[in-house]
Amino acid sequence: LLILSTGRLALLALDHELAALQAGSRTAFFNAIAVTHEPVWPPAPFEPGALEWAASHLAHDPEGQGWYGWALLANEGERAPPRLVGIAALIGRPDDDGDVELAFGLLPEFRGRGYGGETVGALATWAFANGARRVIAHLDAEDSGAAHTLARVGFADTREQPYPGVARWALSAAA
């Protein structure tokens, strides 16, 4: 298993089996990773199609663990099972320029508590250690919470709008 640890989170890289469970059976996925069952899954901005996309790509790229999906787990106490606070994804391996896109989503009750920053920081560090030269995030141009999270981790608004209402933020690897 590929697991990254932050101060409060364990980021579990999905392999094909876990990605397929997440796309096919929420209950089986929660049981497989031994977390509390969440009534709403996946969190925005992810949709079921994104879960199927990750499972499909991992089926064709079994060595791609880490590039297609991560489960974000927080331990809220010794007696309680871990909580699945959100998911994140690097949208495939880096392109020819070394760019890779990052997306993350947290369940509403976990937003505004620093989990997004921990996730983004850990995944950007992992991506750079594994060949990426720049991590890009696209977000709703009006989403000040996500923009604040990205800025705290060192991302900068590129001032590009790849689509109407969408802002592009980027973080480059240290030279």
Language model regions located:
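Conserved active-site tyrosine of GNAT-family acetyltransferases
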Residues: L150
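Glycine-rich acyl-CoA binding loop
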Residues: G114-G117, F128
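GNAT-family acyltransferases
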Residues: L1-E101, G105-P108, A122-A132, D140-S144, ...
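Short, surface-exposed alpha-helical segments at coil->helix boundaries
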Residues: G117, S144-A147
